[in-house]
A protein has these predicted regions:
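Membrane-interface catalytic loops of GT-C/OST-like multi-pass glycosylation enzymes that act
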Residues: 1-4, 28, 32-36, 48-66
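Repeat-solenoid scaffold signature
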Residues: 54-93
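Hydrophobic, aromatic-rich transmembrane alpha-helices
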Residues: 2-28, 76-79, 188
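Signature aromatic-anchored transmembrane alpha helix within multi-pass, membrane-resident enzymes
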Residues: 23-26, 30, 34-38, 77-119
Length: 245
């Protein structure tokens, strides 16, 4: 729930409570829809948890619950508006909603085009959760990283990537040699199984996953694609470092 904005969480709870306490006034088909939504949101994830299913990498395995959450949150928002009878209360309510949504919109603008790494403010936002959860899982930030490499790497440069390399394979110039480093399990050091096999000079690229960005600490970081102070992907220059040695 830390990736769902707080106003929607509150509206979601209100929507559930409203439907429960107004059960007698609902048609049979409405009751059936509500039960299906609850099944989708709660029962299916509960089965996965109780069966000890392997769950990893944030919410991506439970994306199917979000449509149901959105429906019930909308019910909550609309019903609150309907309950308010006085005009000034309705205006105040809409104003509060607009203010709350404006904060969410501001955060999305700050994250663009990586809106999918959003964490709500009550959980501390992206900066507080970046070390606990996946951020740029799909490596979208490697697009900007590739642009930087194409612009700044001399012809014939070697690039070692410990991240999803498919993006770089498509975007890197043909004049740059790309090598993929296998990484060990979280907590191991060094994180690259074959990192010692790469002879400098080279550039090292890593997304924010496990401790991959901590590899080659002797090499200075020359580029970061970051949002809200969190580096999503980075480039380390092990070319300059090798020349100095």
């Amino acid at each position: 729930m830390i990736t769902i904005p707080l106003p929607f969480q509150i509206a979601f709870v209100i929507g559930i409570l409203f439907i429960i306490f107004n059960n007698k006034h609902q048609e049979q088909y409405q009751k059936s829809i509500f039960l299906l939504l609850l099944f989708q949101i709660f029962f299916l994830p509960l089965i996965a948890i109780t069966r000890g299913s392997t769950l990893y990498d944030a919410i991506r395995q439970f994306l199917f619950i979000l449509p149901g959450v959105a429906v019930l949150a909308t019910v909550g928002i609309v019903r609150i508006y309907d309950i308010l009878k006085k005009k000034f209360l309705k205006v105040l309510y809409v104003t509060v909603l607009l203010a709350a949504f404006s904060v969410i919109a501001y955060d999305m603008v700050q994250l663009h085009p990586y809106e999918y790494i959003y964490f709500n403010r009550i959980s501390g936002g992206l900066r507080a959760n970046a070390s606990r959860f996946q951020t740029d899982y799909w490596g979208l930030s490697l697009n900007k990283t590739a642009e930087w490499l194409n612009k700044n790497c001399p012809t014939g440069s070697s690039v070692v990537v410990a991240s999803p390399n498919e993006c770089l394979e498509l975007l890197l110039s043909n004049n740059i040699k790309l090598y993929k480093a296998r990484y060990r399990k979280r907590g191991d050091w060094p994180p690259l199984e074959n990192g010692d096999k790469f002879k400098k000079p080279f550039y090292y690229v890593a997304i924010r996953k496990w401790i991959l960005q901590s590899a080659f600490p002797e090499c200075p970081t020359v580029f970061k694609e970051e949002r809200m102070g969190v580096p999503l992907s980075l480039v380390k220059n092990c070319v300059t470092n090798s020349k100095e040695k």
